Amino acid sequence: MVWKHAGVVSRADPVPESLPVDERWPRAGHWLSAGAGRHPIDLAVLGVPTFARSLNKAGTHTTPAAIRRALHHYTTWCASRHVDLVDLWPWDVGDVDEPDRDDGAFRAQAAVKTALAKARLLVTLGGDGSATVPTAQGLDLKQAGLVALDVQYDLRDGARNTSALRTLFDAGLEGERVSHVGAADWAVSRSHADEAKARGMARFSRGAVEERGIAACMAAALESAGQSGPVHVSFDLSVCDRAVAPACLDAMPGGLRAAELLTAAFAAGRDPNVRTVDIVEVDATADAPDYRTVRLAALVVLEVAAGLALRPQA
């Protein structure tokens, strides 16, 4: 089913025919597509299928739909945290229509702001790394902070998938409110590292994560980014080890383990300052036959939602 409203295309993806139906095993994909009805919205999900500016000529525009389908492989119950997502009210906003067009970023940003006006937390599904920009710009960049999990600093010049951080700095984001987690040796140039330091970014390299642990690094990153306002968290899955994220063309051996990524996702969802999250740089057309990267991205959605369910009461 497909319908369109105000530049957003909404898709209700049916459960894959190969999956059995069991009323006692509710699927997370059904939970998301059911919507909130008349209830206040807890979690909104918006697809931003950017791909045209990618240096890798990737098929990232196929990924939002792939993540939605992958959610059908999981249930709504998180046993270790005693959380059932049926207690949260979701809203699948749909996909921004052709976000790579000249007016695409404007329409994506408008869709983000519409969702934020109704939901406690928004997750956008990219798309290449350029999808980070309109998602973060849904917040007031004069006050907002950013936590970026990425194998590199997106500080290249030009309007590309690897220039999101540069674009946000140009739009008014201050480096002192930016935290970066997971940068790897041999993936960051000396020039970019010097700029990140000069701008006052809080940096937690892959080595720091290994030494301190992902939970401690995320706690420090979120605290630094959230010092004066709401926070956007960007999950560029190229931060992961290539063995678990083969659909991320920049992923390297030695990156984050899947469990570390999911711990970070839960921390983002649980932090009261976090208002927006994105998942980017997954090319569903380049995934392994078992769709491990797409399924990992779907688990990021669920872990963020679990964190939201366990946020401290205001």
Q: What kind of feature is each model-predicted range?
A:
Residues 3-314:
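Conserved alpha-helical scaffold segments that buttress catalytic/binding sites
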